[in-house]
Amino acid sequence: MTERAQSPTAADCRPYEVNRAMYPQAAGLDGLGGASLQFAHGMLQDPSLIFNKAHFNGITPATAQTFFPFSGDFKTNDLQGGDFTQPKHWYPFAAPEFTGQVAGATAATQPANISPPIGETREQIKMPSEVKTEKDVEEYGNEENKPPSQYHLTAGTSSIPTGVNYYTPWNPNFWPGLSQITAQANISQAPPTPSASSPSLSPSPPGNGFGSPGFFSGGTAQNIPSAQAQSAPRSSGSSSGGCSNSEEEETLTTEDLEQFAKELKHKRITLGFTQADVGLALGNLYGKMFSQTTICRFEALQLSFKNMCKLKPLLQRWLNEAENSENPQDMYKIERVFVDTRKRKRRTSLEGTVRSALESYFVKCPKPNTLEITHISDDLGLERDVVRVWFCNRRQKGKRLALPFDDECVEAQYYEQSPPPPPHMGGTVLPGQGYPGPAHPGGAPALYMPSLHRPDVFKNGFHPGLVGHLNS
C-alpha cells in the first residue's frame, strides 16, 4: 500500500484529514526507524492548522517539530492488516485433560459445539494417530461391562486441535444417584458415530450437555437395566408385604363399611342385643372387650377408616355366630357372670362400736402400714380393704376439718393467723429487723404504725349521706 507524495502546500490546504495514518509503524512501513517519530517538513508542525488557532510563539512553519519520541519496545511491526481477517481461538491455552478423573472417559473429550476456524484447511487440522484410553478393568471389573464401541473414540478417529479450550461435559458419575436418571433421559437420543473416512468434517457434540451414555463409567451403561430389574422385585416384595398387613384396608371401601354398619345395626336390633352386649360378646369370643361407645361410633361411621377396617372382621364373625346359633343369649352368660362380679360393691355400713374402735386406732396412728391394717381388720372382723379405705377417708376428712393430729397439727400451725392487735391511739412499736439504717448506727430504728379505726377508714371515699348513716 503506497501513498502519493504531497507537497506542503497541499497538506496545508486540507487540514480536515485528521484520520490519516500519522504513525508509519501502523501503516506497515518498516523502512522508518522506531527510535523516534519525526514528521516531514510542513506536515502537522503547526497545531493551528487542525484546531484553527493562532500560531504559538516559537513555532514557525520553517522549522520542523519532533513529537512524542518512542523507543523500539513499542514497535508494532508484527501487526499486519491481513491478521484481522482470520478468526483466532478465543482461548490461547491448550485444552486440559480430564481422563484421570473419570474412568472410561478418553482424552479426546468432544466439546458441545466446536467447528474448525474459517482460515484453517484440512491440512492444518492435525490428526493424531493414537488416542490414549483408560481401561475400566481396575475399578469396574472385566471389559465385558464396557458399553458398545460406538460410544468411545479409538485410534484413527477424528480429534480436535489442541489450541482450543473445551467445556467439560457434566458427568453424573460423581453423583451415583443421578446416573440412572440421566441415562433414562438420554435413551431416545442416539449418540453420533464419528467418521474416520472424512476427517475434515467438524466434530459432533457428544450429547445435550448432560453427558451421553458414552461418558458414563464402564459398568454403568450395562448395569442400568439390571439395576432396574433388581429394584423391581424389591419394590414388589415390599409392596406385597404391605398388602399382607393391610389387605383388608385395600379391599374394603367406604361404601362397604357403610353397608355393613347398616346391616349390623339392623340385625343387632332384630336379635335383641344392645351395643354393650355386642362389646361384651366380642370380649367373650376373641378376648378383647369393646365398650358400648366403640360399637356406637362404628355404627355411626365416626371411627377412622383404619379402625373400622380392623373392627369389621370381628363384628362380621360375631354376627355370623349370632345368626347361626339357636340361643344367642347363651353367648353372654359366662361374660355376664364375670361382669356382675366386677360391678361396684354395695356401700359398707359400720356399726357404732366398730366406728368408735376405728377412731381410737386412728388417734394412735393415722397412717397404718399393711401389717397394722391386717391386725386391725382381724381384731374388728372386717376386710382389709374396708379398713384401708376407712383410714383413707378419715385422713381426708381430717384435712378438711383441720383437726389437730400429728402431721396435720404441724401443718395447721402454718396456716393459723395471729389475731390482730387491739386498736388504740398510740403507735405500735415493731421489733427491729437487725439491719441498722444509716441514720441510726447504734441500733435498729423503730417502725411506728398509725392506728386506724375501722369506721374512719373509708369515710373519705363514701358519699356524705352514707357517712352520716355509718356514724349513726
From Swiss-Prot:
Gene3D superfamilies: Homeodomain-like, lambda repressor-like DNA-binding domains
Biased composition (Low complexity): 235-245
Swiss-Prot/TrEMBL keywords: Developmental protein, DNA-binding, Homeobox, Nucleus, Transcription, Transcription regulation
Comp. bias intervals (Polar residues): 220-234
Protein encoded by which gene: pou5f1
Residue ranges annotated for the POU-specific domain, each copy included: 249-323
Protein's UniProt name: POU domain, class 5, transcription factor 1
Region (Disordered): 127-154, 187-255
Subcellular location: Nucleus
SMART domains: HOX (SM00389), POU (SM00352)
UniProt-listed Pfam families: Homeodomain, Pou
BP terms from Gene Ontology: anatomical structure morphogenesis; brain development; brain segmentation; cell dedifferentiation; chromatin remodeling; dorsal/ventral pattern formation; ectoderm development; embryonic pattern specification
Keyword Transcription regulation annotated: yes
Presence of keyword Transcription regulation: yes
Family stated for the protein in its record: Belongs to the POU transcription factor family. Class-7 subfamily.
A GO molecular-function annotation: sequence-specific DNA binding
CDD domains for the chain: homeodomain
Natural source organism: Danio rerio
GO CC annotation: nucleus
Record-linked SUPFAM superfamilies: Homeodomain-like, lambda repressor-like DNA-binding domains
UniProt biased composition (Acidic residues): 246-255
